[in-house]
């Protein structure tokens, strides 16, 4: 299937959803997914939800807010309290699962409050082979993964993003700040803040 055929599949899948809440981090994948959802469904049927937390870089939250403002997207920022999740501070190997499960539960509730049928996230085909405990939470909570369903990989998403005029097409991938610490090293808000400030220099 060609890259443009895959995009047509993505568009149709999004149309079939009727309405969607996109988990929006301002990264390459979620920005592309949000743009595709807006094209498929229109602004009235799409909301973007971004988590504000000590493990999410401040500059990414700012970029997410700016993108939604520029594109007229309803943007809801929810407070994620991952450090309050039992076990998270100890930085176990399933850290991403714990965080994503809490986050997607919150996004699911926000979707219901706004009469939105589906929650969607931006994982792609390249994520299938990696160790991604967060995808277990996605499956458990019935969150949609439209980019994987359309069999789009990262390079194809970058190419289509460029065609759509998205400035994120060549944006560097990033992971949450908690990933800077080896498994088993205790995570604190102070440590995460230090990392965020250091990486913004």
Regions found by a protein language model. Give the residues of each.
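Mid-to-C-terminal catalytic subdomains of enzymes
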Residues: 121, 151-201
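ATP-dependent adenylation/nucleotidyltransferase module used to activate substrates
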Residues: 1-163
